[in-house]
């Protein structure tokens, strides 16, 4: 992840992923955080039902971090809750996850998987989790 820079625009201020990662502490992300991330990519919320469901699901302590990430990525890429920036938001969430857990990312493979999940509407969580584990080690 050295040299990786993702800049997001928040009003008059640009925040950098490397200098300040504000949302992930052991998958402690809120819907409000996710909406703010997506707004940084120029999107707006279209439908909140899928996000409400996924946050209810990942708040239980019974599933592991990759499974939680898979649920969140699925909700973003398959259900398209935002008007724009769904894939960029999913990519940011994956980078933030890797940063929090000190994991290495195969960026090209992760991008391939994100595009594949979105274009093929892959809904099987186990399959999404496997893809994420492949790209984030």
Please give the residue ranges for each predicted region.
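FIC/Doc superfamily catalytic core
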Residues: 1-137
């Amino acid at each position: 992840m050295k040299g990786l820079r993702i800049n997001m625009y928040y009003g008059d201020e640009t925040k950098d992923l490397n200098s300040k990662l504000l949302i992930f502490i052991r998958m402690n992300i809120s819907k409000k955080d996710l909406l703010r991330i997506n707004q940084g990519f120029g999107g707006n919320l279209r439908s909140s039902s899928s996000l409400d469901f996924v946050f209810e699901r990942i708040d239980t302590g019974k599933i592991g971090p990759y499974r939680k990430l898979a649920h969140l990525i699925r909700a973003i890429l398959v259900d398209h809750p935002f008007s724009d920036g769904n894939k960029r938001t999913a990519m940011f969430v994956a980078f933030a996850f890797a940063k929090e857990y000190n994991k290495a990312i195969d960026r090209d493979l992760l991008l391939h998987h994100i595009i594949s999940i979105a274009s093929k509407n892959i809904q099987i969580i186990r399959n999404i989790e496997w893809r994420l584990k492949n790209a984030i080690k």
